[in-house]
Amino acid sequence: MEIGGSGAPPPLLLLPLLLLLGTGLLPASSHIETRAHAEERLLKRLFSGYNKWSRPVANISDVVLVRFGLSIAQLIDVDEKNQMMTTNVWVKQEWHDYKLRWDPGDYENVTSIRIPSELIWRPDIVLYNNADGDFAVTHLTKAHLFYDGRVQWTPPAIYKSSCSIDVTFFPFDQQNCTMKFGSWTYDKAKIDLVSMHSRVDQLDFWESGEWVIVDAVGTYNTRKYECCAEIYPDITYAFIIRRLPLFYTINLIIPCLLISCLTVLVFYLPSECGEKVTLCISVLLSLTVFLLLITEIIPSTSLVIPLIGEYLLFTMIFVTLSIVITVFVLNVHHRSPRTHTMPAWVRRVFLDIVPRLLFMKRPSVVKDNCRRLIESMHKMANAPRFWPEPESEPGILGDICNQGLSPAPTFCNRMDTAVETQPTCRSPSHKVPDLKTSEVEKASPCPSPGSCHPPNSSGAPVLIKARSLSVQHVPSSQEAAEGSIRCRSRSIQYCVSQDGAASLTESKPTGSPASLKTRPSQLPVSDQTSPCKCTCKEPSPVSPITVLKAGGTKAPPQHLPLSPALTRAVEGVQYIADHLKAEDTDFSVKEDWKYVAMVIDRIFLWMFIIVCLLGTVGLFLPPWLAGMI
């Protein structure tokens, strides 16, 4: 552009403006140029002839004092398997270099400058217990140089230091990891270390989610190594770190405790349900799957067994032992007299002594088939009882049941019409009649075989006793033609007076039901108003009746012949009674074995509860005593 061309201001107007700008900007620009020129001149003067390989001392005998400090920024990881601790730290170093001094007045009051650390001498301080990576600082940051020769250098570094990790109380463990810093080539006569602070600086520490630093103390040490005759100094920082157990408590400890509790419940489950072994195996499978999931969580080290590993092993043995004991208890529960005989000491210990110690009460389960059969017969007969009162005829029912017998019920057909007054039946031959085994009609029980009330002379009923005697009278052809005998059943119900009953109840039955015996003189005679079903025209001097079992101990018994049908019936009743008695005995012994199994279950229930509690206390007590909880 041409000066003075069209559109340009006149030169006379620009001249004052340029003068004003020049007077205002000239001092600042000259000052900036002067300071930059001063630093440039300073750097040229400091590094002209500077050798970074020689120690910064005036005399060869002087010692370079290096002030050393450590500031931790983050605890990255603690590897229990590889025994390493990874940290992010700032390595603070400070020393004096007499060759790097100047007078600030000569250089526009420049008191400090930042220079590349590669240009100056640096102490070769390394991490002695480095496990992986570089021993020294890899990122060479700039150093801060002061006019008096003091050099400050704080490079960042990520170290993987070796750490002897003790996982005995895992996850309630506390580790002591060290970081040892010192010069690798210079001994104490050349370089000596001085600690800046007694503790590690944690002002810029980023909190970890798994570990917390309890304390970090630095100590100064000197050591003479076998390789060299010189003494080498070092500063060792001890990091006391504690694991935060919340994650392991929720995901590791609580499930183990719950599995142990499930194992205890196995012994509280009744043996009758049949699910004890199923529950044991389910608990074992769940524990196995759980162990597969936590393999990566537990420190895989062979130096020591972690406490949680011991507890898991304890739980595994706990569950396995519960399966073995459950199988044994079920074997005891299903024992019977046919397979095992209960020893006397087992009965004494597990049925008498141990239940009292455990405050156990045996369930009242009683099975008496003999008496149940009698009761069912009473219900079928719709009668108060078949047998006399205990006080008037003691021991009849009890003796029958105790001997393994079951009294056969007697039934009789009631006539549709009222029974008229007729003479008693008399056999033409005055002998015991034959018993017929065919053409047996259905029988219905007497309405009240237990007691009959025939009217006396005054019309008032008199209490008499009842006897049911199984007979079958075969009438002769003449009697059948006359139609005087009307017997419809094998069983005839006789009602005798109290005097007659007393004579019959003086003695207890002593013989077998197969041999039915009585005295003919003691047989009751049918009353005219008897409710029984056989009515005759004429009385008989000797009653032709065959009784099941009657007679006393005073008079000699007389045996009467029985029909084959009655004999088979008595044998069947005896067989049923023997079978029911044996079944009652077997049932009683089986109940004893079941109760023994219940007692064993209760013993192991309390044992496993105590062991589970002791195992839980053993898991938490040692770390608590060590001050880690």
Curated annotation (Swiss-Prot):
Question: Which ranges of this chain reside in the Cytoplasmic compartment per its record?
Answer: 333-603
Its taxonomic placement starts with:
Eukaryota, Metazoa, Chordata, Craniata, Vertebrata
Which positions, given as ranges, span the membrane?
Answer: 250-270, 279-299, 312-332, 604-624
Per UniProt, subunit arrangement is: Neuronal AChR is composed of two different types of subunits: alpha and beta. CHRNA4 forms heteropentameric neuronal acetylcholine receptors with CHRNB2 and CHRNB4, as well as CHRNA5 and CHRNB3 as accesory subunits. Found in two major stoichiometric forms, LS (low agonist sensitivity): (CHRNA4)3:(CHRNB2)2 and HS (high agonist sensitivity): (CHRNA4)2:(CHRNB2)3, the two stoichiometric forms differ in their unitary conductance, calcium permeability, ACh sensitivity and potentiation by divalent cation. Cells produce predominantly an (CHRNA4)3:(CHRNB2)2 nAChR.
Activation/inhibition comment: Activated by a myriad of ligands such as acetylcholine, cytisine, nicotine, choline and epibatidine. Channel potentiation by calcium is stoichiometry-selective, CHRNA4:CHRNB2 nACh receptor is achieved by calcium association with topographically distinct sites framed by anionic residues within the CHRNA4 subunit and between the CHRNA4 and CHRNB2 subunits. nAChR activity is inhibited by the antagonist alpha-conotoxins BuIA, PnIA, GID and MII, small disulfide-constrained peptides from cone snails.
Please give the residues the UniProt entry marks as glycosylated: N59, N109, N176
| Lipid sites, type S-palmitoyl cysteine | C273
Instruction: Provide the residue span(s) of the region labelled Disordered.
Output: 420-459, 503-529
Q: Name one Pfam family in it.
A: Neur_chan_LBD
Q: What is this protein identified as?
A: Neuronal acetylcholine receptor subunit alpha-4
